[in-house]
Amino acid sequence: MGCCGLLLLALIPLFRLTIYAVPYYDDYNFGRFARAAIEQEQSKWAAISGALDCSRTQWYAWQGTYSSIFFMTLMPAVWGEQYYFLGPVFILLLLLAGSMVFTHVILRKVFRMEKWSSLAIQAVITIAEFMFIYSAQSGFYWYNGGIHYVGMHGFGLLFLSVAICLERAEGRTAKGLLFTASVLLAMITAGSNFVTALQGLLCLLTILLVSVVVERRRT
């Protein structure tokens, strides 16, 4: 429990600093698509169509990181600059969820580690991720860069967690839900930055290889 307390103490100032974040550079370059859609259709929900339009445009004009571009375009400040802090909050929560869930799956589901020991290790690993990031300013508090790298890394960890759980799942309902979640997260991860996408592919191939070997040994 002490490690969990340290994790909480480490996160409090990181979340507190989000209120000082402001839009910068590419936040405007991508956010203008969503803002233009909102002004044209006079609907806050039109930002989604603007994000889809930006993803499609950049696919042909720049690169195929469609899910990153989709989230980049939905910069919270397109609905008002006072909402920009929600972007860094979202990034921090994604990394927190991804790290805690992935380490839980590895330690508890794969290695069958005892609950409290596992929780302590999860907390320590997560603290290290937050504390030793190369640039908190760019990784957490600049929405455009943060969502493209740190946020997508969080999605990637969630995808791998679901993939491992799917390989070990029993029952049609559990398998169906995990399969649906894995497809959705795979689509997001595939359109993220190239490093995360490549890591996800290599890890997925490893999971498939291990599952094939285990299945053959059973039979």
Language-model features: where?
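Juxtamembrane "helix-exit" motif on the non-cytosolic side of transmembrane helices
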Residues: 75-79, 104-108, 131-141
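Membrane-interface alpha helices of multi-pass inner-membrane proteins
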Residues: 177-200
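Perimembrane helix-loop-helix junctions
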Residues: 199-219
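Short hydrophobic/aromatic helix or loop-helix immediately within or flanking a transmembrane segment
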Residues: 56-90
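Extracytoplasmic catalytic/substrate-binding loops of multi-pass membrane glycan-assembly enzymes
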Residues: 17-40, 44-50, 59-71
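Transmembrane-helix motifs of polytopic, lipid-linked glycan transferases
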Residues: 90-116, 158
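Membrane-interface micro-motifs in multi-pass membrane enzymes
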Residues: 26, 117-167, 193
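Start-transfer (signal-anchor) and selected internal transmembrane alpha helices
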Residues: 1-12
